[in-house]
């Protein structure tokens, strides 16, 4: 019998703030980081499962400690039993009678639980010798719904409704898989649009994005309206009228200012405004959507669980949503969110602006195409061109599209050398960086 013998964690941080990669109106100096987890087993060929929580620097130690605190809940479990019932494994963590007090199902502990759940899915896909998107897409509708906790959802999506959606898609799975492998999945890029970039860098990267085949770019906005008008004008001139341009305020505004600000940017034919206000403010998003029609409104990367997504959809507060592979309770909760979006007919544009997020969320979007909606040409996965070299199975982008992963698992495994180099504070990079700072002082 194979057994989980250890839960291993690493606080991994990359100095992205040095070049202002990832900078936006609320987060001007992010150091992209990961609370990285490995589920070690005594299975053959060093079988293991990998997962992570994305953070932006300070606090990553807190997030890593939360992941480590889950060791007693998973070490000693049978690998085969975990794989056979990933729904029960997830509920073992999310429904713990004492851990729930730290949420319930939100915040640092919920993200930690999500990382461990994702590592279990990675383990299952590796054991099946399949990339995760294919592993999910080849589960039966009954197996898929068994992974989902429908508590708090039944007023919007029942188990029977979810089964009907999945069963309706089942006859097309083989054809959709072939299409995905042949064509890839559409991507959009945020790489030109970080707020700290110079105008020259913005224009250069926007033109490069179009040349690389991207049909949508996204700019960060929200710090200064005149700067945003200038940057949007430069970007629109660089990409031309036929390329879509979205903007992202990263929760910077109250409701009234969001409406006023977006009315001033409307001339640039905005594809959507992302995170205009607090991710918890369902009614605020609804008011903004009403106030800036026809500009679409989006949120989701900080939406903390399936319940808030349900409310956003029920309230008609959004035109599209972002899912995030590492924000909610793992694959299980993201499957619930994808099915909710399908029920309400709302498009999903997954969030991937962070270390490892492109690698992870591509699997969820592709599984959605094959097993749930059959749609991808009216949506896209975010792409940022940072830090992929640190992963054993990095994303592959060709002509503005994600190519379907072929390597078994969730694409979450990092190179051991990268972990050794960038572990905080004892990795070689950070030791040398601290020494250099002391020398300058």
Swiss-Prot record:
GO terms for molecular function: hydro-lyase activity; L-fuconate dehydratase activity; magnesium ion binding. Substrate binds at residues 22-24, 32, 218, 250, 274, 301, 351-353, 382. Mg(2+) binds at residues 248, 274, 301. SUPFAM superfamilies: Enolase C-terminal domain-like, Enolase N-terminal domain-like. Its cofactor is Mg(2+). Keywords: Lyase, Magnesium, Metal-binding. The keyword Lyase applies. Plays a role in the catabolism of L-fucose. Catalyzes the dehydration of L-fuconate to 2-keto-3-deoxy-L-fuconate by the abstraction of the 2-proton to generate an enediolate intermediate that is stabilized by the magnesium ion. L-fuconate is the preferred substrate with 15-fold lower activity observed for L-galactonate and 8-fold lower activity with D-arabinonate. No activity detected with D-fuconate. Can also catalyze the epimerization of L-talonate and D-ribonate, but at slow rates. This is L-fuconate dehydratase. It comes from Xanthomonas campestris pv. campestris (strain ATCC 33913 / DSM 3586 / NCPPB 528 / LMG 568 / P 25).
